[in-house]
Each structure stands twice: as C-alpha cells, then as structure tokens.
C-alpha cells in the first residue's frame, strides 16, 4: 500500500499526491522516490512501498533491506 498525502481545498481542487522519503537506519542514505535507485534498475517516480522485497540499501549493499528504513517527514511530488 502506498501512503499518499493529498491536500484538497474547499473549492474541490487538490494538490498532487506526495510520496515519502525513507532513510536507512544503518548508514543514513535517503531513498528519494523522485530519483529511484538506478544502481538496482529502480526507475524514477517509484514510491518506497513499491520497491521489490529483494531491494537492498545501495550503500550497505546486502547488509540491510527495506525493513531497515524509516520514513522521514519529507515528501516529494511527481509531475505527470
């Protein structure tokens, strides 16, 4: 499940969906969904929640996976 944060105004118009950045608790590397992870063929605009279960931290390389990442209070928007 992808966690979205959407803000709507009283007139019914809504802002673009926003996606969280995640930080490795071991090395501090930040996964930015706007950039993806080219080292593992993860394209830009891939939300963290959609990364495969086999994905690993590109800095720790095999030492830690998704379970070692924590959500940050930093969000990015995807342009269509």
From Swiss-Prot:
Cofactor comment text: Binds 1 Fe(3+) ion per subunit.
Pfam families assigned to the protein according to its UniProt record, in alphabetical order: Rubredoxin (PF00301)
Entry cofactors: Fe(3+)
GO process terms (BP): alkane catabolic process
Alphabetic keyword roster: Electron transport, Iron, Metal-binding, Transport
Family designation: Belongs to the rubredoxin family.
Gene3D superfamilies for the chain: 2.20.28.10
Single Gene Ontology MF annotation: iron ion binding
InterPro entries cross-referenced by the UniProt entry: Rubredoxin-like_dom, Rubredoxin_dom, Rubredoxin_ET
Organism: Methanocaldococcus jannaschii (strain ATCC 43067 / DSM 2661 / JAL-1 / JCM 10045 / NBRC 100440) (Methanococcus jannaschii)
Residues involved in Fe cation binding: 24, 27, 57, 60
Source organism, top-level taxon: Archaea
Chain's role: Rubredoxin is a small nonheme, iron protein lacking acid-labile sulfide. Its single Fe, chelated to 4 Cys, functions as an electron acceptor and may also stabilize the conformation of the molecule.
SUPFAM superfamilies in UniProt: Rubredoxin-like (SSF57802)
Protein name per its UniProtKB record: Probable Rubredoxin-1
Domain Rubredoxin-like per the UniProt entry, residue ranges: 19-72
């Amino acid at each position: 499940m992808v966690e979205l944060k959407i803000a709507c105004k009283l007139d019914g118009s809504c802002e673009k969906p926003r996606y969280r950045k995640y930080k490795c608790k071991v090395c501090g590397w930040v996964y930015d969904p706007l950039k993806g992870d080219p080292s593992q063929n993860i394209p830009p605009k891939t939300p963290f929640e959609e990364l495969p279960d086999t994905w690993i931290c590109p800095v720790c390389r095999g030492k830690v996976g998704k379970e070692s990442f924590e959500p940050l209070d930093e969000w990015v928007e995807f342009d269509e």
